[in-house]
Amino acid sequence: MSIRSWPREERPRERLIQRGPQALSDAELLAIFLRTGRRGQSAVELARELLAAFSGLRGLLEADRETFAARPGLGDAKYAQMQAALEIARRHLGEQLQRGPTLSSPAQTRTYLAALLRDHPSEVFGGLFLDNRHRVIGFEELFRGTINGASVYPRELVRRALAHNAAAVIVAHNHPSGITEPSAADEALTHRLREALGLVDVRLLDHFVVGDGEPVSLAERGVL
């Protein structure tokens, strides 16, 4: 049954307009993106099928072009639209963070760092550079590794902090496995980075581990 034949108050687009996007299920939001279904299948039914095939939104959003485009109802055009939407969201979050208030708690940076790092299939380490009032100067991806880990060099983080004239740094890396529990190596690295930055009077405010769910703050864990 086509969505157009549904009662108006049950259609995803109308429900979004009336009640906001938070009121919709993943399948309903995806159906709005898809716009149309297939013969004998509404956009919502197609969306449910795709979410099942990709094991949820994350699997769909992280799929490579070949896998994504090969699914009936998707294709290269939809892949391009999806990537554009994701990049718009990332840039919006970045602008929000840069225009926002002084960073004073880990909660203010979680969403932004998760959006930047969560979708990578390999381990990525980055730094968020701040001025002396903890306003954002910029974010840089500094190291990239295999799925087993990234080699992080404290001297490079120090060099980039000095280049930005940063007074403080927040670092983050992802766990491609999705597990956000910091490892002993993560804690040891945090101490090394804090010591290296301290030599040039730059504070390491936090180290986040990004995976499935809420990013974990090592500062909140008492490591910093």
UniProtKB/Swiss-Prot annotation:
Q: Residue span of the signal peptide, if any?
A: none
Instruction: Enumerate the Gene Ontology biological process terms.
Output: proteolysis
An annotated Gene Ontology molecular function: metal ion binding
Q: Does the record's keyword annotation contain Protease?
A: yes
Keywords of this protein's UniProt record, alphabetized?
Hydrolase, Metal-binding, Metalloprotease, Protease, Zinc
User: According to the UniProt entry, where does the motif JAMM motif sit in this chain?
Assistant: 173-186
Q: Where is the MPN domain?
A: 102-224
Residues that bind Zn(2+), according to the entry?
H173, H175, D186
User: PANTHER family attached here?
Assistant: DNA REPAIR PROTEIN RADC, UPF0758 PROTEIN YEES-RELATED
The name this protein carries in UniProt is UPF0758 protein Hhal_2301
Q: Please tell me the species this chain comes from.
A: Halorhodospira halophila (strain DSM 244 / SL1)
